[in-house]
Amino acid sequence: IGKGTVIGNNVTIYKGSIIGENVRIDDNAIIGKQPMRAANSIFKDKSEKPPCRIGNECIIGTSAVIYAGCIIGEKCLIADLATVREDVTIGDMTIIGRGAAIENHCKIGSRCKIETDAYITAYSELEDEVFIAPCVATSNDNSAGKDPDRFKKMKGVTVKKGGRIGVNATILPGKTIH
């Protein structure tokens, strides 16, 4: 835990988590949580993920959950109630809004804004300076769970540098937004 970091009440920081300098972690946040798997999960890897890393001068909001295996750049805001799943990389100066969910295996660029209650599905990539408005939903499975081979076909969403997605939009699997 870096110099100048302030940790709120009832915060859980799991073993090995790396937290930079001058980070603020608000009440009830959970840092470095290992993922859990349902019996029918498509993700079969049960090995322990490496510790999460949070860069300098980040702010982690109340009740935010950041999983192990995440790398969060410097000067990011992960707002209240946001979730950042395992194997996610977030660039510098990015905002993950209140209640937003970033699923596993995503790459989020620098200086992005992902607003309140947005859902970024697994295997998505958002390049630098992307704006995602509130309540945007993305998807990665065209078969809606019906195709037994769907796991081979899953593809998240790609948003190119500077891309913008408006409020309450639904983006289908494999789409690229310029």
Regions found by a protein language model. Name each.
Residues I1-A38, I42-H178:
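Structural signal for interior beta-strand "rungs" in well-ordered beta-sheet cores
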